[in-house]
Amino acid sequence: MAEPPDAATPKTSPYLKGDELSSDSGPLLSIFALQEIMQKVRQAKSEYMAATKDVDLTIPDVQKIIDGVKELASETIYKVVNKPLISYRHIVMQSRDRFLRVDTYYERMSEVGDKIDENEPAKFYETVIKKVRHLRTEGAFVLHNIPTRDHRGMEIADPEILGVDVKSILPVLTAEHRAMVQHILDGAIIENGIVATRDVDVYFGACSESVYRIYNRLQGYIEAVQLEELRAAITWLERLGRRKRMTFSQEFLTDFRRADTIWVLALQLPANPRVIWQVPRCSIANLIMNIATCLPTGEYVSPNPRIASITLTQRITTTGPFAILTGSTPTAQQLDDVRKIYLALMFPGQIVLDLKIDPGERMDPAVRMVAGVVGHLMFTAGPRFTNITQNMARQLDIALADFLLYMYNTRIQVQYGPTGEPLDFRIGRGQYDCNAFRTNFQTGAGYNGWGLVDVENREPAPYDHVQRFIRYCNIDSRELIHPATFGIGMNYYCYNEMLRMLVAAGKDTEAAFFRNMLPFHMVRFARINQIINEDLHSAFSMPDDQFNVLLANMIAGAQERMDPVVLDISWISIWYAFNRSFEPTRRNEMLESAPLIESVYASELTVMKIDMQQMALLQRRFPDVLIEARPTHFWKAVMEVSPEPVRAIMDLAHSHSFINIRDMMRWIGLPSMQPSMKLVLEEEAWAVANDFEELMLTDQVYMFRDMLPEPRLDDIERFRQEGFYYTNMLDGPPTIDRVVQYTYEVARLQANMGQLRAALRRIMDEEGWVRFGGVLRTVRVKFFDSRPPEEILQALPFDYQTSEKGGLTYATIKYANDTTIYYLIYNVEYSNLPDSLVLINPTYVMTKVFINKRIVERVRVGQALAVMNKRFIAYKGKMRIMDITQALKVGTKLAAPTV
């Protein structure tokens, strides 16, 4: 981040920045909170991080991350095109009626991904996930405004949209064959159909089976209309609007329900909060996202200064602790502590305060005593949640006792108890028992939760996981708050008891001050209640089941997945926080889009979980290629291809450096999902990828000595007409009795004995086949019209190297190398001699591959268009395809069309 222009200018008073705290927004406070939390992380982990790897703990830009997530919501995972991909192309040979038909999907898929190495399982995982994403991307298209032509009064499909490229073969066909092809093309009639009361074009074309499955799944998703999901989302948004006191407009509904509109809903509301909260080490990241997306912008308002002037400082000479601090000015660090206090009040239980170890302040009796009094009125310590730690509660008890006892005379009688604990005494003529103010987390005694119900369940909340309503000081957040009148005549148990105790101790001036501060104090907590129960209510809010056990676990010292964040504050900052109230001035700018941000985040997390579940199965399916694989490998592979904003949110507190295998496997096994279009297509892509040959990966690679054909050219015309070619692709696997299975153990044993080459040579001489393990290999497809390079012809299905070092011979053998399926097309001229293709020494090829897919076929002219058997649905040009996902916002008015 660049420094401000005046960064180099010396400041005469570098700490007096009180006015800078006047306005805090949600994103600003989220960055501040993240800075403070990361400071605690640094301190807590500094001891053992010195002995482990270095971790970058820089503070990320939360606003930039959220903007990235919003951009994800605006992206469409499908393409709107006017013609499908060319799925089949033809390679012309010298024959006039025979050609090679190539499935271009397998050609493109063979070029995706890197070379697989059995010693680097991370590369294998990355290759698989890249191929799956490539498949999903190719099949996710919607046809719109397809080109057509008129033929004898009928609408005929343009050849470009049929998915078969016949342009390359037309020049070499006879007139009879060209007429036959043209007749077939003229028969590609466009039919009229109806999808969800919308008129569409229907025609038959060609498409690779894998791509068509993705396309068909996407089309089924669109044809299902998602009407119930949309109604549920609108109903839920209206509920959320009532909870957050925002208006949800339905004006856009009249826009996309017109008869000329096809609308698509890619996400669903509400987001499943379990998906968000089951991510490993997610508590801090979700807390920061809750602050950034929901916390309103506000100002820190001070009370009327006359309250102090007519009570604490009414005399010319004022030497009491409160009077001394009344005119003090906070420093920048102390104002930061005020921010921490209000963050802790807005996130009870999640953020807990503790006192800094500051010998200078601890020795200042005035600061400690004042903080001890106002701390009991600012914080809650049980019975349902707490804002402070046990240590801080005890220190505040001691400070309160010191204030009550620092100056008393014979008129103020004090009777000490037997235990010697803080506040174990009776004071005043009425002998007020100060033991009642000693901290008791089971009853909330001595603090704001004392004698009242500060957590309640009312009407069902929009988010199922957060049904609690916070009631600080027994204030109902639904009440209308007017600062001029609210709080007058109101009270609650702890405040009343504090006034009674102060009067009993002879602190009449301080009691008068607190009595006059009560309306200001009630307005403060009324605002906080509203912020917690309305603005901060989101999927990033901590679930009730985890919130309810925070206090009990803290008291018992039990460690759970969701532990509170402890922030340190100074003694005097408690006084400054008491004299300032957070007054919201405007709602968070991202409040209306927060539900969409949550849904996008949950959807991406679900897709990542599906990917990791499928990756976890690979090691069991193909152990030979994943001998050294660990769960961290597929975790990193999926993270590598996931959107950057989602990775940034998950790693907002740099927790990925400390996630272990147990965290990963536990998350992968949890069943919670967030439905979305991306999830539907991802699941279908993995269903296709269960057959790994669809990803151009195979374990059916054999070593077999075969002679490259060298035919005699006795009849050149017939040879050309046959369309002669050679390939190392097998039509079927060899018979099992002729195949020798070479596992890693067998190969290493023979290599260590120095007999591997000899053993393989003996098998080749006996015309046997060798299969090297069950390792998956990447398969490439190449075509040649002349002799292929020697490195392809002589390639072996394994890598074997020997080296000598220190008098010892070392052998290295690897199976997972790239395999090439090649097609050699023989071209001859009429001037060639009969033995033009014959060599003195034959050429041997050693690698054979079997894939149970029709990648290349030799077909006749009549079969060239026989693959047009897939039904396509295309939306008419005058129809609008509208993605209404962006309309799922509180307060939105219009859905923007994508076409």
Swiss-Prot record:
Per the record, the domain of life is Viruses
Q: Which organism is it from?
A: Epizootic hemorrhagic disease virus 2 (strain Australia) (EHDV-2)
Primary gene name: Segment-3
Q: Which keywords, in A-to-Z order, does the entry hold? A: Virion
> Any idea what this protein is called?
Core protein VP3
Function statement:
The VP3 protein is one of the five proteins (with VP1, VP4, VP6 and VP7) which form the inner capsid of the virus.
Q: Which GO terms describe its molecular function?
A: structural molecule activity
> According to its UniProt record, where is this protein mainly located?
virion
Under Pfam families, the record lists: Orbi_VP3 (PF01700)
Instruction: State the family named in the UniProt similarity comment for this chain.
Output: Belongs to the orbivirus VP3 family.
Positions the record marks as coiled coil are none
User: Is the keyword Ion transport assigned to this protein?
Assistant: no
Q: Which InterPro entries does the entry mention?
A: Inner_layer_core_VP3_Orbivir (IPR002614), Inner_layer_core_VP3_Reovir (IPR016029)
Record lineage = Viruses, Riboviria, Orthornavirae, Duplornaviricota, Resentoviricetes
According to the record, the residues making up region (Disordered) are: 1-22
Subcellular location per the Swiss-Prot or TrEMBL entry: Virion
Task: Give the UniProt entry's GO cellular component terms.
Answer: virion component
